[in-house]
């Protein structure tokens, strides 16, 4: 028999959505902004999360 595949990590967007559900919109937006600050660039995924985290 085959073993089950290893669990997959959450995508960045899913991680932001989880933060939004657990801690609220403000926390999710700050979390997303700090990610861009730490990697010194603004990626498209970060912008999508910032624009949509309060929806």
From Swiss-Prot:
The chain crosses the membrane at residues 24-40. The keyword Nucleus does not apply. It is a single-pass membrane protein. GO terms for biological process: cellular detoxification; response to metal ion. Its main location: membrane. GO terms for cellular component: extracellular region; plasma membrane. PANTHER family: CADMIUM TOLERANT 3, PROTEIN CADMIUM TOLERANCE 1. This is Protein CADMIUM TOLERANCE 1. It comes from Digitaria ciliaris (Southern crabgrass). The lineage of its organism: Eukaryota, Viridiplantae, Streptophyta, Embryophyta, Tracheophyta. The gene is CDT1.
């Amino acid at each position: 028999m085959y073993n089950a595949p290893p669990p997959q990590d959450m995508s960045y967007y899913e991680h932001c959505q989880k933060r939004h559900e657990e801690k609220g919109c403000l926390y999710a937006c700050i979390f997303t902004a700090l990610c861009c600050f730490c990697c010194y660039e603004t990626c498209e995924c970060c912008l999508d999360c910032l624009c949509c985290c309060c929806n």
